[in-house]
């Protein structure tokens, strides 16, 4: 309806008071790879309980992250968080953070990181490997290329599909 009328009703997250942190997540684990950040975003979404009154979803205030997150790390964190109903998040030390009513406090340590990796580990043979949801960045394409450079994969290795935009593909091809 909004596309047809050109109007958007002011509701939900369009109200400033609705965009306040309601969950505190203290990160004590060492996160380096984009996959680690994806695991973090996925993890706090899975911690939600019926007792939490978060009609618009968990909106965590995350502390303990490095101040120099890469584009790939930020993308991995936010994409995974969105998959589990988190419409937005705040990172301590990054921008202005409004005061919010914190309903729960969680700690994400090495044990939580390892346990979530184990839960998500394939339990059967992998038939296809996909990268790029959301679309792979140039940095992610470079990382895949670096991992595969000089490797000879077995004939029965599953196919690898990398999804990206035409612009990122062009940059990756041009820059090697």
Language-model features, listed with the residues they occupy:
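Thiamine diphosphate
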Residues: 174-176
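Intrinsically disordered, low-complexity segments enriched in small residues
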Residues: 2-166
């Amino acid at each position: 309806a909004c596309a047809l009328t050109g109007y958007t009703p002011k509701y939900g997250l369009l109200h400033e008071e609705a965009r306040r942190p309601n969950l505190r997540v203290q990160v004590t684990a060492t996160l380096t790879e984009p996959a680690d950040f994806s695991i973090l975003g996925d993890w706090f979404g899975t911690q939600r309980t019926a007792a939490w009154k978060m009609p618009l979803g968990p909106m965590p205030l995350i502390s303990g992250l490095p101040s120099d997150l890469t584009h790939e790390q930020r993308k991995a964190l936010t994409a995974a968080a969105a998959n589990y109903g988190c419409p937005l998040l705040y990172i301590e030390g990054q921008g202005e953070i409004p005061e919010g009513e914190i309903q729960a406090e969680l700690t994400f340590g090495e044990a939580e990181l390892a346990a979530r990796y184990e839960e998500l580990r394939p339990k059967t043979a992998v038939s296809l490997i996909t990268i790029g949801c959301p679309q792979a960045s140039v940095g992610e394409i470079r990382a895949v290329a670096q991992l595969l450079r000089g490797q000879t994969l077995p004939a029965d290795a599953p196919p690898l599909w990398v999804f990206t935009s035409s612009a990122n593909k062009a940059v990756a091809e041009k820059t090697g």
